[in-house]
Amino acid sequence: MFTRLGSERGAAAVEFALVVPVLLLLLLGIIEFGRAYNTQIELSGAAREAARVMAVRNDATAAKAAAQAAAPSLNPALTTGQITIGLSNGSSCAANASTTYPVVTVTAAYPLKFLTGMFGSTITITGKSSMQCGG
């Protein structure tokens, strides 16, 4: 038959030591993905709010301030330099001679720093929104 060559004492500890690094990598990957996904949702909401303010008030400064206010959990905070506002007619939200209202597009780009460094040091995450001017 078969005989025991030695005690199996401590085998569970060895198996645990082999599995723990894999489980920790999986856990840290889930945490990093969750942070990145949350940041993208926050940026999309901030861009949507800025597009709404720009479409109604035709004020780029107020639109950028609205985007910053709509993303309070970003740390460090979203800056005005990370927010770009574009208009389909290139100038303002005012209607042109044919009474067609332009479309405003707001893009917010944010450099997210990873906590663990497993995926590099930073990644740029973007939120984008478009609305027709005219309220």
Question: Can you say where each PLM-predicted feature lies in the sequence?
Answer:
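Alpha-helical assembly-interface signal, strongest on the long, hydrophobic N-terminal helix that forms
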Residues: 1-71
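Short, conserved structural patches
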Residues: 45-135
